[in-house]
Each structure stands twice: as C-alpha cells, then as structure tokens.
Amino acid sequence: MVKVLAVLYDGGKHGEEVPELLGTIQNELGLRKWLEDQGHTLVTTCDKDGENSTFDKELEDAEIIITTPFHPGYLTAERLARAKKLKLAVTAGIGSDHVDLNAANKTNGGITVAEVTGSNVVSVAEHVLMTILVLVRNFVPAHEQIQEGRWDVAEAAKNEFDLEGKVVGTVGVGRIGERVLRRLKPFDCKELLYYDYQPLSAEKEAEIGCRRVADLEEMLAQCDVVTINCPLHEKTQGLFNKELISKMKKGSWLVNTARGAIVVKEDVAEALKSGHLRGYGGDVWFPQPAPQDHPLRYAKNPFGGGNAMVPHMSGTSLDAQKRYAAGTKAIIESYLSGKHDYRPEDLIVYGGDYATKSYGERERAKAAAAAAKSA
C-alpha cells in the first residue's frame, strides 16, 4: 500500500467550520476516506520548516507528496535525496517552482512532478484585476479612513485615478496573463501591452486589442500599470530589482500574483517609499508565510497608501479549491491505477525529462551552450 504525505496550511477553526476549505490540514483535499478505503495511508501536516520538521521526517518513506503554492513544502535536492521511495510529487494548484526539477529528474529513476493546470487561472486573473482597481482607485487608505472614524475626501482623492486611458502591460501572457488582458478590455485602457517570448496569435491580439512588445524595458517605460504573470525560474528570479524598477514610469503601479521571488522585496519597498512606484499589490511573498518584519507588509508611498498586499489567497478561492482538489485526486488516481494516463498539460517532469515546453527548451539551451563551450 502507498503512503501519501500532504503538506497543507492550517485552517484552524475556519477549516473546522467550513468544510469547503479543502486546502487545509483539517479537510485534506477530501482525500482521506478515499485513500484509506483503498488501504493507503495519508499523513497531513503544516509543519514544514526548520530541522526535524514533520515534513522532513514523513517524506523519507512517502511514495506520493502533495504540496501547495499557498504553504509550499520546498522539495530541495537534499530533501529528494532522502526520499528513497518518492515517485510522485503533486502541486495542489499551479506552479512547481518549489520543487528542484533537475533533482526530480535524476532521483529514484525520475520522480513525476505534476500540477493541476488551469485549476485557478480564473481566480488569479480576477484577483489581478481587483488589485489593479484597488491601487489605482486608492481604495485601501480611503477605507482605513472610514474605519478610523474620519472623513477627508481630498486626502483620499489626491491619489485616486481612473483606469480608463491608462497603459497596462503584463509580463507573461500565458493562461493567467491572457485572461487578465481580456478582463481589462472593457475598461477602455489607452493600450494593453504584453511581454512574452511566445507571441499570441494575430487573431487573439486583434480580439483582445493588445500588442506585444519584444523588449521588457521598452514595455515598462510605457506602462502606467504592470502586472507580473510569468512563472518563477532561473531567469525570472529577482527580475524586478532596483535597476529594472528604475526603468518603469515614475508613479506607476506594480501588481504581482505570480511568485514573490520574482521581485527583490527590499527594492520594491524602497521604490514604493520614494514614490517611484505609486503602488504595489498582490498576494505572493518570499518566503512564505511572510515573516513579521517582511518589508512589503508595511511599505507605503509618500501619500500614506499604495500597499495592496494580502496573504497568498488569489488562487485558493472556494471555487478554485474544488477544482484543484478534484485535479489532485485525478492525478493520484492515475498513479495508483498504474495507468499513468495523466493530462499532458498537468505534467512538469515525467520519465526523467521535462514535459513542459518552457522548462524543456530552457534546459536544452543550457546544455547546448555548455557543450558548445567545452567543444
């Protein structure tokens, strides 16, 4: 029989009171009865950090590991080396940057890494649009003013703008980035731009009313609002540093619901405090959970606002949790049945090789460059 380890976040009393919070340790993605009825074992924990964590102890003899972007259990090369029985790593959600994919390819004959592709793209896209509006309309300081018992229209309005007539650009135009652009179309923005190595079709560009910019700095210089919708990998880690942020328009807004490590948190906080960035918002942090002294918890613009940060929640609405719980079960069922008939789009690593175009192309390019250098 198979041991399944799930690293999920603690929902506390909320997880106990709301069974639809499937991504919590209280509700375990709805998997326990289904697995135990088949004779399998499910171990669930939220203890994932520090020496001798439950995650580390239980991983050693687990055959399947379930992790989540909202409370990531980092599958480093060192951890994978100790996981002698591990065959399948499932992300309940999307994004497998918490897994050392090179090590997964080489461990135990190749660990399959899969995620529930598409399960929360609508949820994240809606959150992006909400965050843009919250920042541009200066909602948070205005709401805080009311809660404090004050009434000062001018104080709120002096940093409030319309989204109409603004230039908005997305870094990445995959499943989420494209949906963000589609949701922005009715707002009559001056222009919708995107930066991505792979262009949309001419038909999609015409339908959405967007335009590709081949150079990232060129796009940033034009945008009033920039939203990050690309995956985290070696080329995007720390991408938005002090130098790149300086290329953005003074007084622009930056939204990040992709991954916290794509930005340098200290540089974003500095740009916000100086007013170079009028606002920063999103739900992704590095590390996660964010420590109490994380600079993006407290950084504000010179007007006393511009911070729209929340916990990592954009992709874990109750509707999204239904989808990624069902998708996680389907992936595990495919493994347990021996059929391994996974949805191709869910596979990140399979059979000791990359199964996704972007990762595969990137790794092959690195290998080719190394071979050429040594020749």
From Swiss-Prot:
Pfam families: 2-Hacid_dh, 2-Hacid_dh_C. It comes from the Eukaryota. SUPFAM superfamilies: Formate/glycerate dehydrogenase catalytic domain-like, NAD(P)-binding Rossmann-fold domains. It is found in: Cytoplasm. InterPro entries: D-isomer_2_OHA_DH_cat_dom (IPR006139), D-isomer_DH_CS (IPR029753), D-isomer_DH_CS1 (IPR029752), D-isomer_DH_NAD-bd (IPR006140), FDH_NAD-dep (IPR033689), NAD(P)-bd_dom_sf (IPR036291). The record marks 259, 312 as: Important for catalytic activity. Signal peptide: none annotated. GO terms for biological process: formate catabolic process. Substrate binds at residues 94, 120. GO terms for cellular component: cytosol. The keyword rRNA-binding does not apply. NAD(+) binds at residues 175-176, 196, 231-235, 257, 283, 312-315, 358. PANTHER family: FORMATE DEHYDROGENASE 1. NCBIfam families: PRK07574.1. Homodimer. This is Formate dehydrogenase.
